[in-house]
Amino acid sequence: MSSLRIAMFLLVVLMVLIDCSTAIPAADKERLLNEVDLVDDDGSIETALINYLFTKQIVKRLRNQLDIGDLQRKRSYWKQCAFNAVSCFGK
């Protein structure tokens, strides 16, 4: 549950940054985008790869958090089984 809160918080922060950056003039917008670096950008392929992999990992975690319908379905199934084993496993 706390990871869902963290993901939602990051999503809200990202939305606020995007909203603020659209209202900022182009020169300030470019400066703001250049200040947000995952790893110090020295132009090397290793740095670009680290940034790519880190971003890919974050996106994967966010996508996994969005698919909670399946988890809720499984949870309700196991609750039913815990309450009435015959309904799950038969006689």
Curated annotation (Swiss-Prot):
Residues 1-23 form the signal peptide. The keyword Phosphoprotein does not apply. It comes from Apis mellifera (Honeybee). Disulfide bonds join C81-C88. One of its GO terms (cellular component) is extracellular region. Residues 24-59, 73 form a propeptide. Its main location: secreted. Keywords: Amidation, Cleavage on pair of basic residues, Disulfide bond, Secreted, Signal. This is Prohormone-1. The keyword Disulfide bond applies. It is found in: Secreted. The modification Phenylalanine amide is found at F89.
